[in-house]
Amino acid sequence: MGRGARAAAAQSRWGRASRASVSPGRTIRSAPAVGEAQETEAAPEKENRVDVGAEERAAATRPRQKSWLVRHFSLLLRRDRQAQKAGQLFSGLLALNVVFLGGAFICSMIFNKVAVTLGDVWILLATLKVLSLLWLLYYVASTTRRPHAVLYQDPHAGPLWVRGSLVLFGSCTFCLNIFRVGYDVSHIRCKSQLDLVFSVIEMVFIGVQTWVLWKHCKDCVRVQTNFTRCGLMLTLATNLLLWVLAVTNDSMHREIEAELGILMEKSTGNETNTCLCLNATACEAFRRGFLMLYPFSTEYCLICCAVLFVMWKNVGRHVAPHMGAHPATAPFHLHGAIFGPLLGLLVLLAGVCVFVLFQIEASGPAIACQYFTLYYAFYVAVLPTMSLACLAGTAIHGLEERELDTVKNPTRSLDVVLLMGAALGQMGIAYFSIVAIVAKRPHELLNRLILAYSLLLILQHIAQNLFIIEGLHRRPLWETVPEGLAGKQEAEPPRRGSLLELGQGLQRASLAYIHSYSHLNWKRRALKEISLFLILCNITLWMMPAFGIHPEFENGLEKDFYGYQIWFAIVNFGLPLGVFYRMHSVGGLVEVYLGA
C-alpha cells in the first residue's frame, strides 16, 4: 500500500510540472537545467580541443629530430675542430720549447762563455736547420703530392711584395754566407773547420727554405695536418733563434775590428799577431761585404717567421670557393694623383744623394761630423712632412662616406699586428737615443739634431700606423664597381696602328687622365696623393738603412753611453725591424691607395 501511494504522488507531481511548463505567463524553470546539461556535455570537447592545440604548439616549438646523417656529420665536424685545436696547441708548445732551449743556450753563451761557447750554439742551430731542411724536402716531395692535399689556396697570403722581399733578403743572406766562407778560408790557419761546415749548412737551408716558401706560401694543406703544423713550427722556431743569435752575437764584428787594429799596429811596426789574411784585397772585400749584408740576415729571418706563421694558420683551413674567383685587390693604375708622386720623387732624389755622399764618406777611416749633420737634417725635414700627411689622411678617412669593413679577416689582422710590432724597432732605438742625449751632451748641434730626429721618428710612426690601419678597415671602392663597365673595357681587343694612331692614342690617354683627375672626388684625390707620397717616402727611408747606412751605430754617442755590446744588441734588434716596417708600410699604403 505504501509503495502504490508513493507512485501516485510522483505521478501527481509530474503532472503539475508538465502543466506549469505549458501554461502561458509562467516562467520556464526547466530551460536552464537543459542548457547546463548541454554545456556540461560540451566542456570535455573544449578541453580536448585545448589539449590538441597545446600539443600542436609544443610540437612546433620542440626541436626537430635530426637525421642520423646530419648528427654524424656534425659530430665529425666537432671532432675535426677539436683535432685542429689540439694540433695547433701541440705544435705551438713544440715551438715554444725549442725557442726556450735555444734562448737558454744563447743567454748562457753571453753570460758564461767558458761553459757554453759559440760553437755549442752553432751545433744546436745546425741540428735544428738539418731537421727543418728534412721536413721542407718531405713537404715538397710527399705531402703536397698526396691526393687532395692542397685543394684550396689562400688568395690573401703571400702577396708579391712579401715574396719579392723573401727572395731579395734570402739572396743577400746567401751572399753573406759566401763572404763569411771566404773570410774563414782566408784565415784557415786560425779558424776551426766547423765554421765552414756551419756556413755551408746555412746556405743549403736558406736556398731550400726560400724556394719552398715562394712556391707554397698560399697552401691550405688538408692531409697530414698535425705533422705539417709541427714542421712549420719547428722551422719558425729555427728562424727565430737565428734572428736572436744575429741580434746578440757580435763576435764577427769584434774580430773584424781587432784585425783592423792589428793592421794599424802592423803599419806602425808593432805587429803582435800572425793570424792575418794573406790577400789583403780579398779580405777587405769579404769584410765590407759581410758588414754591409749583415742586417739582411735578420730581416730575412723575420720575413720567414711571418710567412711560416701564415702557413701554419692555413693548415686544415677550408677557403670558400668565391674567395679565389676574383682578385683580392684591384689592379694598380697610376691615375688621379699628380702632386703626391712629384713630391715623393723629390724626397727620393734627395735621399739618394744623401745616401751616396754618406756611403762615400763611410768608405774612409772616419766619418766627418758634417755628414752626420746632413743625414739627420734630411730626416728632420722629411719626417714632419710625412707626419702631417698622415694626420691629414686620417682626418679625411673620418669624413669619408665609405663604410667600415667589419668582416673578420685573418690576413688583415696579421698585417695590423706586424705593422704595430715592427714599429717597435725604430721607436725603441729612438727612446734609447733620447735618454743618452739628455743624460750626456744635449747642447751640441749634432745632438740636438739627433734628439729632434728621435722625437719626430716616434711621432711619424704613430701617425702613419693610424693612417694605414684606418685605411685598411675601410671597404674598398673597387668592390662596388659595376662589372659590366669592366667587362666592356676588357672586351675591346688590342689592335695595331700607325705612329699617327699611336700619338693620337697617347693624347687621348693624357686627356683622359686629366679628365679623371679633375672629376675625382676631392677626398679620394687627397687620399691618392697622400698614399703615393708616403709610398715613395717609405721606399726612401727603407733604402737608406737597408743598404748599409747605419749612423745610429757610427756616431759613437749611444755606443759610448751604453757600451759596445749592449748598443750592438739594441741596434741589431731595432734596425731590421725598422727596415721590415718600411717594407710592410709600403704594402699597406698600396692597399690604401687601391681602396681609394
Curated annotation (Swiss-Prot):
Main location: membrane
Lineage: Eukaryota, Metazoa, Chordata, Craniata, Vertebrata
Activation and inhibition: Activated by extracellular acidification. Activated by Zn(2+) under non-acidic conditions.
Recorded catalytic activity of this chain's protein: H(+)(in) = H(+)(out)
UniProt region (Disordered), positions on chain: 1-59
Residues found modified as Phosphoserine: S21, S23
GO annotations of cellular component type: membrane; plasma membrane
Organism annotation: Homo sapiens (Human)
Quaternary assembly: Homodimer.
Keywords, ordered alphabetically: Cell membrane, Hydrogen ion transport, Ion channel, Ion transport, Membrane, Phosphoprotein, Transmembrane, Transmembrane helix, Transport
BP GO annotations: proton transmembrane transport
Low complexity: bias regions: 1-21
UniProt-recorded name of the protein: Proton channel OTOP3
Coiled-coil region: none
Known function: Proton-selective channel gated by extracellular protons.
Gene Ontology terms for molecular function: identical protein binding; proton channel activity
Residues on Extracellular side: 110-119, 182-193, 249-295, 359-372, 436-446, 548-566
Stretches of the chain found on the membrane's Cytoplasmic side: 1-88, 144-159, 218-225, 313-338, 396-413, 470-529, 590-596
UniProt keyword annotation of Cell membrane present: yes
Family: Belongs to the otopetrin family.
Topology versus the membrane: Multi-pass membrane protein
Pfam families hit by this protein: Otopetrin (PF03189)
Chain segments annotated as transmembrane: 89-109, 120-143, 160-181, 194-217, 226-248, 296-312, 339-358, 373-395, 414-435, 447-469, 530-547, 567-589
Disulfide bond sites: none
